[in-house]
């Protein structure tokens, strides 16, 4: 059973000083910069971008 390198094995949360364990906006235990494309446009012309404060990829608010 291997432990994720970003995960504190005792509490299974990001290690001290690190931001995240996984997610489309998490790389090497840190949030990707705000404005990094996390989901390319698929026909609607709108891409989704990382916020720089969460490992999730929020839906572009202009997508309807």
From Swiss-Prot:
Subunit and interaction comment: Homodimer; disulfide-linked.
Keywords noted in UniProt: Cell adhesion impairing toxin, Disulfide bond, Hemostasis impairing toxin, Platelet aggregation inhibiting toxin, Secreted, Toxin
Tissue-specific expression: Expressed by the venom gland.
SMART domains, sorted: DISIN
This protein's GO CC annotations: extracellular region
Organism in which the protein naturally occurs: Echis carinatus
InterPro entries: Disintegrin_CS (IPR018358), Disintegrin_dom (IPR001762), Disintegrin_dom_sf (IPR036436)
Intrachain S-S bonds: 6-29, 20-26, 25-50, 38-57
Name of the featured protein: Disintegrin schistatin
Residue ranges of the motif Cell attachment site: 42-44
Chief location of this protein within or outside the cell: secreted
Similarity section: Belongs to the disintegrin family. Dimeric disintegrin subfamily.
Its biological purpose: May bind to both alpha-IIb/beta-3 (ITGA2B/ITGB3) and alpha-V/beta-3 (ITGAV/ITGB3) integrins, and may inhibit platelet aggregation.
Domain Disintegrin: 1-64
UniProt-annotated location(s): Secreted
GO molecular function, one term: toxin activity
Gene3D superfamilies: Disintegrin domain
């Amino acid at each position: 059973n291997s432990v994720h390198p970003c995960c504190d094995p005792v509490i299974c949360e990001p290690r001290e000083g690190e931001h995240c364990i996984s997610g489309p906006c998490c790389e090497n235990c840190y949030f990707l910069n705000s404005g990094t494309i996390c989901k390319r446009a698929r026909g609607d012309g709108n891409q989704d971008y990382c916020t720089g404060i969460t490992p999730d990829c929020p839906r572009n608010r202009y997508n309807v």
